[in-house]
Design a protein with these regions (language model features):
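Short active-site neighborhood of thiol/selenol oxidoreductases, capturing the structured segment around
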Residues: 40-51
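N-terminal leader/targeting and pre-domain segments
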Residues: 20-40
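Bacterial Sec-dependent N-terminal signal peptides
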Residues: 1-22
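Charged, amphipathic alpha-helical linkers/stalks
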Residues: 125-161
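Thiol-based oxidoreductase modules, predominantly thioredoxin-like and allied folds used
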Residues: 22-28, 48-50, 62-89, 98, ...
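Non-catalytic, surface beta->alpha helical segment in thiol-disulfide oxidoreductase systems
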Residues: 98-140
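Short cysteine clusters
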Residues: 53-56
Length: 161
């Protein structure tokens, strides 16, 4: 009996440890996430999802819990999730023009948009690559938008845009 209890406790501890290895999504309001990002000198990563979105559920269950995702995201971001059809998510949906799900926003601590990724993927390396592109000032959506408005995108940038 004692062995059984010990094994169960050991398994629960192992499962809890595994669950913490992925992306640490925090239960914060939008303003709290911005304040925390500013205090920690990080970006804000926003997972924009809906309750009925299959790819959103896949990202939440199979991609974000992966250790490699946590290793990449947790030092760089304050990560939060918002249902775009409920509560504060409705306001964010309108503010950032989210039209498809999942959409992922990379925001500066002042709340301005640095980058937007539309659509999920099961390929972790590919997703991290997209996020890295968004963190780079010269390849982020914000940078490309500004260059586009000035009519200064080269062919390679135009394809990426």
């Amino acid at each position: 009996m004692k062995n059984s209890i010990f094994i169960i406790v050991l398994l629960l501890v192992h499962m809890a440890t595994f669950a913490q290895e992925g992306v640490n999504f925090e239960d914060l309001t939008f303003d709290e996430a911005l304040a925390k990002a500013k205090a920690e000198n990080k970006f804000v990563f926003v997972d924009c999802y809906t309750s009925w979105c299959g790819p959103c559920k896949y990202m939440a269950q199979a991609v974000f819990p992966q250790k490699s995702m946590g290793d990449f995201f947790n030092p760089r971001f304050v990560s939060v999730k918002f249902d775009m059809e409920r509560g504060e998510g409705k306001e964010l949906n309108e503010k950032f023009g989210v039209k498809a799900y999942p959409t992922f926003l990379i925001l500066r601590p002042d709340g301005t948009l640095q980058h937007k990724i539309v659509g999920g993927t099961g390929m972790i390396e590919m997703f991290i690559e997209k996020v890295e592109r968004g963190l780079n000032e010269k390849t982020s959506l914000d940078y490309l938008d500004k260059k586009y408005e000035k009519g200064k995108l080269n062919k390679k940038e135009l394809v990426r845009y």
